[in-house]
Amino acid sequence: MSETADTNQTAVVLFSGGQDSTTCLAWALARYHRVHTVAFDYGQRHRVELACRQRVREAIGQHFAGWGARLGEDHLLDLTSLGEISDTSLTRERAIEIRDSGLPDTFVPGRNLLFLTYAAALAWRLQARHLITGVCETDYSGYPDCRDDTIKALQVALNLGMDSHFVLHTPLMWRDKAQTWALAETLGGADLVELIAEHTHTCYLGDRTQRHDWGYGCGECPACRLRAQGWRRHRGLC
């Protein structure tokens, strides 16, 4: 929601290891003196992203010394029960299809609501006021838990429920994928763009056997198509 922050405060970034969350991590590292990260194992078929996120953290420490010094604790939380109750193509080995509702069956009901609730509970313990998530309402699949109204409502609920003053930041909310690539370049130059292309993971099928100019992936799933189209627009190739 907010695009400004106090550099003397602490943040928690919901960091999956994908393009969007890595860009958000860079955004937070440019603003806060201490930035913790959290991810969730919810039985996702593309759980290779959980290994990628460690390589991203290591690469940030190696190539961005100032940012590396600000990186705080990393947390991986077990939410496999979400995968057990979800009947989706992100948590089952099946083809990706569009439901009668118009939503793709990659939508995992409650996922971002739970992620942010757990992240807020962690932030409460760490005395971190700022929560950063990479949800957006532009180049996305229509997921209702990615919408700006949802995040604003959740911020109110979390603050009431924890008697706190959290600020939920969504740096990508009104940016498309081309603008997300551009933001990464603004934040960390060509080195960050290359880090994202090489080390992050977006593909819903978990494919890291095919390397494209925009990164690894099957090239056919909705996540790969959005990432590839954004890259081409950012590079002026379409």
From Swiss-Prot:
Reaction it catalyzes: 7-carboxy-7-deazaguanine + NH4(+) + ATP = 7-cyano-7-deazaguanine + ADP + phosphate + H2O + H(+)
Family: Belongs to the QueC family.
Function: Catalyzes the ATP-dependent conversion of 7-carboxy-7-deazaguanine (CDG) to 7-cyano-7-deazaguanine (preQ(0)).
Annotated residues for binding of Zn(2+): C203, C218, C221, C224
Cofactor note: Binds 1 zinc ion per subunit.
Keywords: ATP-binding, Ligase, Metal-binding, Nucleotide-binding, Queuosine biosynthesis, Zinc
Any one biological process term the GO annotation gives: queuosine biosynthetic process
Pathway assigned in UniProt: Purine metabolism; 7-cyano-7-deazaguanine biosynthesis
E.C. number: 6.3.4.20
Superkingdom to which the source organism belongs: Bacteria
Cofactor(s) needed for function: Zn(2+)
Organism listed in the record: Alkalilimnicola ehrlichii (strain ATCC BAA-1101 / DSM 17681 / MLHE-1)
Alphabetized InterPro entries for the sequence: QueC, Rossmann-like_a/b/a_fold
Gene giving rise to this polypeptide: queC
Binding site for ATP: F15, S16, G17, G18, Q19, D20, S21, T22, T23, C24, L25
Name of the protein described by the UniProt record: 7-cyano-7-deazaguanine synthase
GO-annotated molecular function: ATP binding; ligase activity, forming carbon-nitrogen bonds; zinc ion binding
